[in-house]
Amino acid sequence: MVEPLLSGIVLGMITVSALGLFVAAYLQYRRGNQFEI
């Protein structure tokens, strides 16, 4: 079994990475729309 602390760190890193990707994609999407309009 994986230690709770290790699993918590892994889950936290995955969540932060996913959030960062979503934010970056959203900002790029808005930036692209601003340039197109």
UniProtKB/Swiss-Prot annotation:
Chief location bin: plastid
Localization terms from the record: Plastid, Chloroplast thylakoid membrane
InterPro entries, sorted: Cyt_6/f_cplx_su5 (IPR003683), Cyt_6/f_cplx_su5_sf (IPR036099)
Membrane-spanning segments: 5-25
SUPFAM superfamilies: PetG subunit of the cytochrome b6f complex
Gene Ontology cellular component annotations, sorted alphabetically: chloroplast thylakoid membrane; cytochrome b6f complex
Pfam families: PetG
Signal peptide: none
Keyword Thylakoid: yes
Membrane topology field: Single-pass membrane protein
Keywords associated with the record: Chloroplast, Electron transport, Membrane, Photosynthesis, Plastid, Thylakoid, Transmembrane, Transmembrane helix, Transport
A single BP term in Gene Ontology: cytochrome complex assembly
GO molecular function ontology, one term from the record: electron transporter, transferring electrons within cytochrome b6/f complex of photosystem II activity
Family: Belongs to the PetG family.
Subunit field text: The 4 large subunits of the cytochrome b6-f complex are cytochrome b6, subunit IV (17 kDa polypeptide, PetD), cytochrome f and the Rieske protein, while the 4 small subunits are PetG, PetL, PetM and PetN. The complex functions as a dimer.
Known role: Component of the cytochrome b6-f complex, which mediates electron transfer between photosystem II (PSII) and photosystem I (PSI), cyclic electron flow around PSI, and state transitions. PetG is required for either the stability or assembly of the cytochrome b6-f complex.
The protein's name in its UniProt record: Cytochrome b6-f complex subunit 5
Protein source organism: Trieres chinensis
